[in-house]
Amino acid sequence: MSDASRVAVVTGATSGIGKATVQALRGKGLTVYAVGRNEEALSELATTCGAKTIRADVRDTAAIVAVLNGVEVDILVNNAGILSTRAVFQDIDPAEIDAMIDVNLKAPMHLTRALLPGMVARRRGHLIFIGSIGGQSAFPNSSAYGASKAGLSLFCDNLRLDLLGSSVRVSEIVPGRVETSLYRTSIPDNQASAVLYDGYRSLQPENIARVIENVIDLPVFVDVARVEVYPTDQASGGGTMVKFQA
């Protein structure tokens, strides 16, 4: 299929990896539906790159699917995710546990379930999931987040088994440290930059969008099951990162 005939849906589209992915795919000529809650940011995407927008909480599958009624979706980028708190597990508010499981695991499962039958019937489609090294390795103060991302990773593995022979591809992109707003909600007093980014060469959202572009452009019989992406200053597994020495 030509890029102009392909249709993509990107969740968490108003910032970070999601926004960069929308811009990259629109730059290739795809029709892109950007899903997010921030009306102003969605309007900006519509104006600057011509994305179609769906203002909805990613947990509201019905609202998203209603807009996509009759649309033949070729690519679903399940990007939306939250790290709402960083604390030892015994101190986490139970509501925070529910939120991370709902957004990071249940929402992509439900949206995938809604769009997948059409892909299977058409014998084409690509499901992209933005995972996390936090779902591959243990990190302190990340029990609920890590569990949600580990569950997502195993879901991808099982989904591939369910889809064998269907020509529908499943790819999990597992980034290392990316400079996005994810941590800014969980690190207090606007300390995220000082703690995580100052002096480090972190990945940028555009780097991950480039990986997604490369994965979807491979021949349709080639399925990149999982790819881990790190800055050169971060060790595999993500637990060790050094500051850049010029």
Segments and roles (model prediction):
Residues 87-89, 93-101:
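Substrate-binding pocket helix/loop in short-chain dehydrogenase/reductase
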Residues 172-173, 191-238:
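C-terminal helical subdomain
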Residues 112, 148:
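Active-site helix of classical SDR
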Residues 132:
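Residue(s) in the substrate-gating loop at a strand-loop-helix junction
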Residues 14-15:
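Conserved glycine-rich cofactor-binding loop
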